[in-house]
Each structure stands twice: as structure tokens, then as C-alpha cells.
Regions:
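Charged docking surfaces used in two-component/phosphorelay signaling
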Residues: 17-25
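Acidic catalytic/metal-coordinating carboxylates
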Residues: 35-38, 62-65, 70, 89
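Active-site residues of response regulator receiver
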Residues: 55, 82
Length: 101
């Protein structure tokens, strides 16, 4: 059985490593992106991504922009994993189509 592929997007390499290690141990295949622009490029290059775990505050393209771009063409599940914890941020995430915040 083929492993599900998860795209982990965060500009902090330590956070990506922490999430990746947890997911790999759970049996998932993990691809990393260090900024929003790389995330979009990777998503469209890899046609079999099953889930995106996405930070908000990143260089080049923030998580909100990434979500808008991907939601134009895909319903892939997106989980926001971010330090932005205000209610308005969470509401914006759900308005943009994230599945969990």
C-alpha cells in the first residue's frame, strides 16, 4: 500500500523537522517547503499530495495566499499550524477554505 503524501510548509526548519519526524514515524511520506512560493510550486508539481499542513507567517507568499491559490484548483485538505491564534485569524482561515486551524 502506498503511503499518503503530506506537504509540510513552514519557514522555520525546526518546526518542519518536528512535524515531519512525527508524521514519518506514523507512516506518512512527507515533502517539505520553506516558504509559500515553494509550497505552491511543489503542490502543482506533485499531483498526489493528500494533505497540506501550512504555516501563515512566511516569506515570499504567506499561508493565506497559498490557501487562496490552492483552493482555486483543489479541495485537498489543509490544516493551518501557526502561532496566529486570534479568533479573526481562525475565521479568516475557515473563510479561505482551510479544514482545520
Amino acid at each position: 500500500m502506498e503511503k499518503l503524501k503530506i506537504l509540510v510548509v513552514d519557514d522555520e526548519s525546526r518546526m518542519r523537522k518536528l512535524v515531519k519526524d512525527f508524521l514519518v514515524k506514523a507512516g506518512y511520506d512527507v515533502i517539505e517547503a520553506g516558504d509559500g512560493e515553494q509550497a505552491v510550486d511543489t503542490f502543482y508539481a506533485q499531483k498526489d499530495i493528500a494533505l497540506i499542513i501550512l504555516d501563515v507567517m512566511m516569506p515570499k507568499m504567506d499561508g493565506w495566499q497559498v490557501c487562496r491559490e490552492i483552493r482555486q484548483n483543489s479541495k485537498v485538505p489543509i490544516i493551518m499550524l501557526t502561532a496566529k491564534s486570534e479568533e479573526r485569524d481562525e475565521l479568516l482561515g475557515f473563510d479561505l477554505g482551510v479544514d482545520e486551524y
